[in-house]
């Protein structure tokens, strides 16, 4: 291992928690690396790029896409090394206390400390279990909604009864020509206010009903009709549609901690059992964002920022025990003086 290969902090995950960890780690003058499974930074927010996010203090309502842009810009402030399209499969520790992060392709990354910021894990949408459905994914079978404009003046059917399905039904109802929602159970399981909004809208809901067949048009490239089956009566009906959205939840890949030799305490078969300081049961390994669980945990993007700051502060003291417990606030920090002067010049133009 070359000295250049060893990092002070390696952040696994490039979502909000990971990006803020990288920013704050740079602020505390640590050599930092981000490793992200996806081909881009931003995390799960990519699933809802056009949704408005209201609950970040001091920040006016912002779209997911804009928030990603700002988070990435901030996260790269101190030029951390960024590794994309890379899956960390295990973490081990040598006799000198250095962590080795092994990837699915056999590469190794070396770090003095690790911050796990993998959110809800590597998420893959649960696909529609109908033979041949995958061929329509290039036309009008959707597992995410990346652009509301796509559904303008279209007849849309959404399959699912959780928060995501209900949210998209409410978002699309004033935009689409017609919105249908089909759910295999008798009652929707989303937030009460969202369910009430949906039931009072023009959207039409089919309960105890599932999509059982996709019927293509004459060109065989896109779905033209869906066949719905009522599980109570056995009745089968056809519905003409333009777009199909499937919200059946996500399959979670949790192999990272399962494959690791470290004895990291886990809660609910996935989450890292930590504390309010973002510490795990393993010295030098920290957690931030949704992957971290402890009493009083705030499961919001805003909470992820606090987790990240706590994790970085603990990492700094782990590496340098006599370091300050907290980093200096940005308004008085020397590293921003030059940047502040440049920003003030721009403001004065």
From Swiss-Prot:
One Pfam short name: Pyr_redox_2
Entry cofactors: FAD
EC class name: oxidoreductase
EC number: 1.18.1.2
Cofactor note (record): Binds 1 FAD per subunit.
Reaction(s) this enzyme catalyzes, per UniProt: 2 reduced [2Fe-2S]-[ferredoxin] + NADP(+) + H(+) = 2 oxidized [2Fe-2S]-[ferredoxin] + NADPH
Keywords associated with the record: FAD, Flavoprotein, NADP, Oxidoreductase
One Gene Ontology molecular-function label: ferredoxin-NADP+ reductase activity
The organism's place on the tree of life at top rank: Bacteria
Residue positions binding FAD: 36, 44, 48, 88, 123, 290, 331
Family: Belongs to the ferredoxin--NADP reductase type 2 family.
Oligomeric and partner information: Homodimer.
Protein name, UniProt field: Ferredoxin--NADP reductase 1
Organism of origin: Bacillus anthracis
């Amino acid at each position: 291992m070359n000295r250049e290969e060893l990092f002070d902090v390696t952040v696994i995950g490039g979502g909000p928690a990971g990006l803020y960890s990288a920013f704050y780690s740079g602020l505390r003058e640590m050599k930092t690396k981000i490793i992200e499974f996806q081909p881009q930074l931003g995390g799960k927010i990519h699933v809802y790029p056009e949704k408005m996010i209201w609950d970040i203090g001091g920040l006016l309502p912002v779209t997911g896409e804009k928030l990603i842009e700002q988070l990435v810009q901030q996260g790269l402030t101190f030029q951390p090394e960024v590794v994309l399209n890379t899956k960390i499969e295990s973490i081990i520790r040598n006799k000198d206390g250095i962590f080795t992060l092994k990837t699915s392709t056999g590469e190794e990354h070396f770090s003095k400390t690790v911050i796990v910021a993998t959110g809800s894990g590597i998420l893959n949408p649960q696909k529609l279990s109908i033979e041949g459905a995958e061929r329509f994914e290039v036309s009008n079978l959707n597992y995410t909604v990346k652009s509301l404009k796509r559904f303008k003046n279209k007849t849309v059917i959404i399959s699912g009864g959780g928060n995501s399905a209900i949210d998209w039904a409410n978002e699309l109802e004033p935009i689409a020509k017609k919105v249908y929602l089909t759910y295999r159970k008798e009652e929707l399981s989303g937030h009460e206010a969202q369910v009430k909004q949906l039931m009072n809208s023009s959207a039409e809901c089919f309960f105890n009903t599932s999509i059982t067949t996709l019927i293509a048009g004459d060109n065989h490239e896109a779905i033209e009709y869906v066949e719905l089956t009522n599980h109570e009566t056995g009745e089968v009906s056809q519905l003409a549609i333009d777009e199909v959205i499937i919200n059946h939840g996500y399959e979670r890949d949790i192999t990272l901690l399962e494959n690791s030799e470290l004895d990291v305490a886990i809660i609910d078969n996935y989450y890292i059992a930590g504390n309010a300081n973002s510490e795990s049961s393993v010295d030098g390994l920290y957690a931030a964002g949704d992957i971290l669980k402890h009493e009083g945990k705030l499961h919001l993007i805003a909470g992820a920022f606090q987790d990240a700051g706590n994790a970085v502060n603990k990492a700094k003291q782990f590496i340098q025990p006599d370091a300050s417990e907290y980093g200096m606030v940005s308004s008085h920090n020397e590293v921003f003086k030059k940047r502040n002067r440049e920003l003030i010049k721009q403001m004065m133009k």
